Amino acid sequence: MSSLSKEAELVHQALLARGLETPLRKPELDAETRKTRIQAHMTEVMHLLNLDLTDDSLADTPRRIAKMYVDEIFSGLDYENFPKITLIQNKMKVDEMVTVRDITLTSTCEHHFVTIDGKATVAYIPKDSVIGLSKINRIVQFFAQRPQVQERLTQQILLALQTLLGTNNVAVSIDAVHYCVKARGIRDATSATTTTSLGGLFKSSQNTRQEFLRAVRHHG
């Protein structure tokens, strides 16, 4: 992790200190080598499923999956992909809640490697800095691009923003459909899971907490 940005390193260390980091091994192979290895293993998996990889529809599937894993849906495992963060001095002395609603996220259940599909609402009360609004979306997407459990994902986003913004006054709520529930097992096609993580005033002040929860419930 020698080439990490300062912000990526701060967030990674904060998550480690709190026991909230995704279980990770120290990286040993570069991205291209990992893709080559994954492609070989996926070829074997497909053979074991009795799929005919000489068919032109399936022939390139192992390579596609390997590229998708490393470059896309699991790209958040590599902190070199942590978004560039823009912080602006809070010269306007903004001290009211800033909320970004309906942030689209797609993640992967770490137990079955199937889709988690949902939306996040993130709020914070600025202290010394404000953050570019799109950066909140990018932070959500970074941590979603990993094998995840929703509870940890919610807390990772919270702690990352607390670390970057220098304030505990952050709140995160995620509402998501888990395809490990929808497409297998119980096969419940209508249920969704909501997780919330609150810090600072969002936890200690009932009024602030209720204002955030109203924003989460607002759809009009």
Swiss-Prot record:
Keyword set includes tRNA-binding: no
Record-linked InterPro entries: GTP-CH-I_C/QueF (IPR043133), GTP-CH-I_N (IPR043134), GTP_CycHdrlase_I (IPR001474), GTP_CycHdrlase_I_CS (IPR018234), GTP_CycHdrlase_I_dom (IPR020602)
Keywords: GTP-binding, Hydrolase, Metal-binding, Nucleotide-binding, One-carbon metabolism, Zinc
Keyword Zinc carried by entry: yes
PANTHER family (UniProt xref): GTP CYCLOHYDROLASE 1, GTP CYCLOHYDROLASE I
Recorded family membership: Belongs to the GTP cyclohydrolase I family.
Name this polypeptide is given: GTP cyclohydrolase 1
Organism: Yersinia pestis
